[in-house]
Structures are given as structure tokens and as C-alpha cells.
Amino acid sequence: MLGIETTCDETAAAVVSRDSDGKGHILSNVVRSQTDEHAIYGGVVPEIAARAHVEMLDHLIDAAMREAGIDYAALSGVAAAAGPGLIGGVIVGLTTAKAIALVHDTPLIAVNHLEAHALTPRLTDAIDFPYCLFLASGGHTQIVAVAGVGDYVRLGTTVDDAMGEAFDKVAKMLGLPYPGGPQVEQAARNGDATRFAFPRPMQGRSDANFSLSGLKTAVRNEIGRLESVSEQDVADLCASFQAAVLESTADRLRVGLDLFEQRFGAPTALVAAGGVAANQAIRGALDDVAQAAGTRLIVPPPALCTDNGAMIAWAGAERLALGLVDGMDAPPRARWLLDANAQVPGKFANTRAGF
């Protein structure tokens, strides 16, 4: 299965295989990050991202096929992320996949980008359903019950900012380079996490939703109170912000796991995916939550937590095994709910949160 990923600022192509027993193998996984193109703007510029996908995608697909050592006739299908994401990039990837499928008379699978994240641990760790997914990235923050391929129940979501977006915005306030998440984590190692008393959003609530906009505002207010911001101030602000995120996340996940068990029984694992899962402090907090809940934590390797083609190819292979294929009229989608019956929590609606 060839997989194509172009939903944000990574251009990626990969080839994976799936055995009859469900075991997966990555034959190639080629990713070209656009970080340098967007760094000078302090964030992703959709038009620049789409143009970069156009320039790079054909070359990356060729490289992935060569590395896998197969030709197009050997493909069982072509999978592309059809959303949710920046619509220009989604169109580039999906249109390319349609062309390949049409020319080589092979099935097309239009993959939900979030489903690809959700199914990645079945590629890396061959885990059984049902499991609890914590997906945290620059565009999404969700707790999802993964009951089967195509069977997802969202237990909690952010009502405003995504977690990765909050890290990036705090980094920008403090003058740290883009992408900001790793910069905040690094600065926090040298900081005093108790210096600034930031709020712990949503803590103690009976639902499993997240909120990060108020915490982000609290950081901005503290910066404004400082006459000048020293290197130590930056470290202390980052450490205090990250500590608040950790405590809030742990609380939300404890509630999410309780909701999971009420509906599905004990999960086979707590799984973390998305770029935020690369943060070692957050991994530590997740591990503590998993142990307290009597389950294990599974985090795919960093290269498979962030956006990549292998996860798209694997989701395509899982869907193809169930006979789920798409026609040439499969639409690109800027918004695409993972769980078809999901309701926006309360009055909130935020495209970046995945609604």
C-alpha cells in the first residue's frame, strides 16, 4: 500500500505491507518537513505549504517506491489523507493519489488523517482493540476510544486551542524559534515550575474535555508584568506553563479512561500520538496515568507520532482488508470528524480542534 500525507507542513510518502494475520511492515517512509519555509513567519502559511507539496510530492513518491523496491503494478492500493487539514495541501495529495490509482487501475482509499494516527499503534505494536487514544498535535487534542477500524468514539476534546498550538503560541510570546513545542520543553528543563501559579484548566470536571486558551492568556499576562524578560524568566515561564499542561492533561486523561471503562471495559492500552507525544515530560505524565489505571502506555517512535506517509498507508491497508475503498469522487475535506456521531461540546466549535 502506497500512502500519501499532505495535510499540513510535512510532505510524505511511504509503502507498507500487511500480512494476512494483520501484522504490518514499513517498506519505506520518506518525509520532507517544511519547517525552514515557515520558520521566518512563526507558523505554517497555507499557500506556501500547498506550493511546497506540489514541488516535492512526485519526487517523494518516486523515492518511497524505489526504497521499497517495488513497482506500481505490485501495489494493492493507493491511500491518501483526504482531510482534515489545510485544504490546499489535501487537494494536492488526494489528486495525486487519484491519478496513480486511475493510471495503474488500483483501489483508492481516502483516509481520515486522524484515523491514521489512531491506527498507528497497530502497525508498530500490533495491539488489539479496544484501546484509548490521546491525540495531541498542533491541530488536534482529543481522547478517543478506538473500538475497531472505522469505529471511534470521542470521549474528550479541546473546546478552544489544540495543545501543540498552545505550546507554539507560548514560544512565540517568549521569542523562541518555530516550531515552538520543542523549544518550550528544552527551556523548561532549566526553569522553576513553581515560580508562576498558572491555572489548571478544566481540572475536576466530570467530562474529559480540554481548554488551553485561558492558560495561554495567563502566560501572556505574566510576561506583561515583567519589566524585562531574562533568559531565566523564559525558563521559569516555560516550566510553569508546562507543569500546568501536565497536571491538566493527567486529570483529563484519568476522567477519559474512566469514561472509556464505563462504555468499553478495560482498554488494551493507553496510546499517545501526534507531535506533542514527543515531549518527554508529557510522556512521563501519561505513563503515570496509565500505571495508575492498570494499563500500559504505548507511544509510537517519534517519526511515526508526527505526520508521515506510513500511517496513511497503514490506515489504507487496514481499510482495504475490510473491503473499504473509495471512488474517484472522494472529496478533499478541511473538516472531517473522526467519529461520525460526534457532537461539538457545548457551544464550542473550532476547526483547529478537529470539529
UniProtKB/Swiss-Prot annotation:
GO terms for molecular function: iron ion binding; N(6)-L-threonylcarbamoyladenine synthase activity. Transmembrane segments: none annotated. SUPFAM superfamilies: Actin-like ATPase domain. Substrate binds at residues 135-139, 168, 181, 279. It is found in: Cytoplasm. One of its GO terms (biological process) is tRNA threonylcarbamoyladenosine modification. Keywords: Acyltransferase, Cytoplasm, Iron, Metal-binding, Transferase, tRNA processing. It catalyses: L-threonylcarbamoyladenylate + adenosine(37) in tRNA = N(6)-L-threonylcarbamoyladenosine(37) in tRNA + AMP + H(+). Fe cation binds at residues 113, 117, 307. One of its GO terms (cellular component) is cytoplasm. It comes from the Bacteria. Pfam families: TsaD. Its EC number is 2.3.1.234. Its cofactor is Fe(2+). Binds 1 Fe(2+) ion per subunit. Required for the formation of a threonylcarbamoyl group on adenosine at position 37 (t(6)A37) in tRNAs that read codons beginning with adenine. Is involved in the transfer of the threonylcarbamoyl moiety of threonylcarbamoyl-AMP (TC-AMP) to the N6 group of A37, together with TsaE and TsaB. TsaD likely plays a direct catalytic role in this reaction. Belongs to the KAE1 / TsaD family. NCBIfam families: gcp_kae1, T6A_TsaD_YgjD. This is tRNA N6-adenosine threonylcarbamoyltransferase. The gene is tsaD.
